[in-house]
Amino acid sequence: MANKREFSLEKTRNIGIMAHIDAGKTTTTERILYYTGKIHKIGETHEGDSQMDWMEEEKERGITITSAATTAQWKDHRINIIDTPGHVDFTIEVERSLRVLDGAVTVLDAQSGVEPQTENVWRQAENYGVPRIVFVNKMDKIGANFDFSVKSLHERLNANAIAVQMPIGAEDQFEGVIDLFDMVADVYDEDKLGAKWETIPVPDEYKEEAESRREEMIEEIAEVDDDIMEKFLGGEEISNEELKAALRRATLDLKAFPVFAGSAFKNKGVQMMLDGVVDYLPSPLDVKPYIAHDKEGNEVELLADDNKPFAALAFKIATDPFVGRLTFIRVYTGSLESGSYVLNASKNQRERVGRLLQMHANSRTEIPEVFSGDIAGAIGLKDTTTGDSLTDPAHPLILESLDIPAPVIQVSVEPKSKADRDKMDVALQKLTEEDPTFRAETNPETGETLISGMGELHLDIMVERMKREFNVEATIGEPQVAYRETFTVPTQAQGKFVRQSGGKGQYGDVWIEFTPNEGKGYEFEDAIVGGVVPREYIPSVDAGLQEAMKNGVLAGYPLIDVKAKLYDGSYHEVDSSEAAFKVAASLALKNAASKAGAVILEPIMKVQVIAPEEYLGDVMGSITARRGQMEGMEDRAGAKVINAMVPLSEMFGYATTLRSSTQGRGTFTMVMDHYSPCPKSIQAEIIKKRGGNA
């Protein structure tokens, strides 16, 4: 079986390209594909014809929304690349891809260094233990500064960044890079789109600086490797092979992060960074074995071995215009032929894999089989969703699923006609399958459809896709905050439902104790003694509560973080039924509301604003006016960085305010941090607006 492999596991790299929005990730990926012979014409993001950004919305906005997976070949290695979005609204895409990668290239903008979303993706990569190399891009840009970028890695990410190159010049004088191992200069031929370069001895004017930087690099490698340190202190000669091997070990152990320089747009430095992917990033054999669990809950190590039973993770669902529903999978162990059956262990369902595809942005090649360490697209998996485990039917295993954040912002969508309504239902079903942070639901009172997501841009793009891919014309309401409700005071309440209307009546009676359960969600406890509520009705009490909690008690927002203990009640031999106990449970919740100190919770965002110092007063004033709590401040490259916690409801329209108060020089990012009770006055306003019960 293993002899059908085109590339050995040692020569396979699964990497992600990650960065802040606009640092040049997609352009970098484009260049990789160009140099590895995958495309014949280079696409430019700012011209809207980039190969990786294949959805219309991405081409228009010049940002990457979905992580396109593609395969390239470099120096007899296969490199599977996932291009991830840099915009914070698409964090789930980054999380998903990090779960299935073995290594990553972090792209920095040479002028800005580490930016807010760089910090987010870096932290996510730390969580998953993903080794990284860094590509300082845009060295040709005005204000480009390689040393500042390396320093920002140390200071802002506490990362042991080791520069393995130095740039020759910067801004419009940027000509190429000096390799500090071989002490040669790679100078590019502008006319040949960077596919041609000349390796020359280090120019005289750079010799001294290059020597001192090489010394510094050796010292930094010695600090993370005892063998090198011993030779270094003993004044022995250390070969480049030994240095590179030591740096590879340190990179795999997350003790060091090699740094490269270049300009993807100007086609300089990308090939050396590709060498870095091969030299320093792990093959599937170098990473710690992935841990799965068998039916009994025992841990099982998944070794990258084609002869072991098959196990893979479905990490993304996409609707492809040519092949329909496409499931992206990462194979951890074993192999799988197209046409065979797999067990979706998460749902305990057998599914047939019709065809297997190797993806290249949005074109594809059909392949007969996938092996451990591969990333591929599968067609035919109808019930598989993001995060599901696919395994050999004889060896069911559950791989750890993805941690999916709850959406924080909501808008209503009203189809313009009856035909649009039908198309919209299909569209929403497909889009929610593809993106687990996007939800669609119907408000039972008003009948309107509400969609929720991670931010305004996220929802804009989804509405845009409904229009373009599914032809749905719809009117969009104002963005609404996804509030929640909770109880703050323990209380007990009875719910009794009795209805007698000739013949068989209805009877259900329960006493429930409700207690706050902060941060732990909903819990149900059955404390019935002596059968006062018969066994068969207890699940109905639980179900009745969960249903009632969907529409809260104050303003119809979902009720969260409550523990319900059913401790007493009564029943009627003839009239009691599951339905009656369901209603009784919802009445108990309603009756508890007035005594349980119900409050409305609002999402609080972690906001980071970066603005020149002269606007500091205005920026801080504006944050305070938005009920923001300052968390601290730092200096960064001639600007002030302000960290604050601000309620989401106060952040609508902030981008415009910030632009005008800083003359377009301020930027901000925000991520959901936690839920917190609303001030009384705001709670009263929300209840009034929703026609709830104060």
Swiss-Prot record:
List the GO molecular function terms.
GTP binding; GTPase activity; translation elongation factor activity
Is Cytoplasm among this UniProt entry's keywords? yes
Q: Which UniProt keywords apply?
A: Cytoplasm, Elongation factor, GTP-binding, Nucleotide-binding, Protein biosynthesis
The residues the record assigns to binding GTP are 19-26, 83-87, 137-140
Which portions of this protein are annotated as coiled-coil regions? Answer: none
Give the PROSITE patterns listed for this entry.
G_TR_1, G_TR_2
Single biological process term from Gene Ontology: ribosome disassembly
Compartments it resides in: Cytoplasm
Q: Which Gene3D superfamilies match?
A: 3.30.230.10, 3.30.70.240, Elongation Factor G (Translational Gtpase), domain 3 (3.30.70.870), P-loop containing nucleotide triphosphate hydrolases (3.40.50.300), Translation factors (2.40.30.10)
Question: What residue stretches are annotated with the tr-type G domain?
Answer: 10-285
Q: Which domain of life is it from?
A: Bacteria
InterPro entries, alphabetized: EFG_II, EFG_III, EFG_III/V, EFG_IV, EFG_V, EFG_V-like, EFTu-like_2, G_TR_CS
Pfam families recorded: EFG_C (PF00679), EFG_III (PF14492), EFG_IV (PF03764), GTP_EFTU (PF00009), GTP_EFTU_D2 (PF03144)
Q: Where mainly located?
A: cytoplasm
What does this chain do? Catalyzes the GTP-dependent ribosomal translocation step during translation elongation. During this step, the ribosome changes from the pre-translocational (PRE) to the post-translocational (POST) state as the newly formed A-site-bound peptidyl-tRNA and P-site-bound deacylated tRNA move to the P and E sites, respectively. Catalyzes the coordinated movement of the two tRNA molecules, the mRNA and conformational changes in the ribosome.
- Name recorded for this polypeptide: Elongation factor G
| Record organism | Lactobacillus delbrueckii subsp. bulgaricus (strain ATCC BAA-365 / Lb-18)
